[in-house]
């Protein structure tokens, strides 16, 4: 009887300890353990942030799983979950900048939890900068006012959504991917002037459809990568292959015709209300056009 009581007490103690811990499994099957901490913070909207200039939004993350969405209730609202103090993200807000980053100071590089849930205002124009190392990010900027985007991905995966027409003109959209993957949906809704794509050992799927009436330009510099483009149907399309080293081009769109080995145009070129020019520099890369 005594032994049964002792075993029951030990089992209860173990359950209490487990309740205070986080256990996750990564893709390789390794177990993640640590005490889970949580931090919430909200910065309310006020007139001091309405300067008439775009607000800078800087996200700088390491080993994170991050979700970005919009809010109409505050300037920024964050919820962080982390299993190591060294991973704790820091939120800093000035009159012209929202900055979030985690520094990895003193971290031993074991497996850990570092989750971001970030909501940013849809009331102000934003200049978005993202730096992601060994991270998994989901950015839904459909209802935000996006002036520009500059994303650097290193050994990371990203999904970006632009499901609604941008409320302000976007100057540029730049993505630099190194050993990473990115899926971009509805990029045409941004109404960008120039999209710059720099890919090295990466896989990119870019949906250029969406509503806008601006001419645009896409510049691709890809090395040992796979790039897939989905084209809008309401634009004149011209594709120019500036450099072509041990690469392949797959045209899976009946609208696109070949003018030469390095130039393609859409049917009835010159009749659409806007144009999209695509310039590609390819090295050991597969470019697919749909």
Region spans (language model):
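Positively charged n-region of N-terminal signal peptides that target proteins for export
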Residues: 1-5
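Sec-dependent N-terminal signal peptides
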Residues: 7-13
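C-terminal motif of bacterial Sec signal peptides marking the signal peptidase cleavage site
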Residues: 17-20
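Short linear S-[DN]-x-LW-Φ motif typified by the pepsin-like aspartic protease active-site region
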Residues: 23-101, 113-131, 136-152, 160-163, ...
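Short, surface-exposed interaction patches in beta-rich subdomains
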Residues: 40-48, 99, 103-112, 160-290
């Amino acid at each position: 009887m005594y032994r049964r009581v002792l075993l029951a007490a030990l089992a209860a103690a173990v359950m209490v300890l487990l309740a205070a811990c986080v256990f996750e499994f990564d893709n390789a099957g390794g177990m993640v353990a640590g005490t889970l901490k949580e931090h919430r913070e909200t910065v309310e909207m006020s007139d001091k942030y309405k300067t008439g200039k775009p607000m800078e939004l800087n996200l700088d993350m390491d080993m994170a799983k991050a979700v970005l969405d919009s809010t109409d209730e505050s300037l920024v609202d964050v919820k962080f979950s982390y299993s190591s103090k060294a991973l704790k993200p820091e939120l800093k807000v000035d009159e012209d900048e929202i900055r979030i980053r985690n520094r990895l100071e003193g971290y031993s590089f074991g497996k850990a939890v570092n989750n971001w849930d970030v909501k940013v205002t849809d009331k102000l124009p934003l200049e978005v900068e993202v730096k992601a190392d060994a991270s998994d990010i989901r950015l839904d900027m459909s209802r935000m006012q996006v002036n520009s985007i500059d994303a650097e991905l290193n050994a990371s995966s990203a999904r970006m959504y632009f499901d609604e027409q941008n409320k302000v003109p976007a100057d540029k959209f730049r993505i630099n991917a190194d050993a990473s993957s990115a899926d971009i949906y509805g990029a045409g809704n941004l109404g960008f002037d120039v999209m710059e794509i720099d890919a090295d050992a990466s896989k990119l799927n870019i949906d250029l459809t969406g509503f806008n009436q601006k001419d645009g330009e896409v510049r691709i510099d890809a090395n040992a990568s796979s790039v897939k483009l989905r084209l809008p149907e309401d634009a004149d399309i011209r594709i120019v292959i500036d450099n072509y080293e041990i690469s392949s081009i797959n045209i899976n769109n009946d609208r696109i015709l070949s003018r030469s080995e390095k130039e393609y145009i859409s049917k009835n070129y010159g009749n659409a209300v806007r144009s999209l020019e695509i310039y590609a520099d390819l090295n050991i890369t597969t470019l697919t056009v749909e």
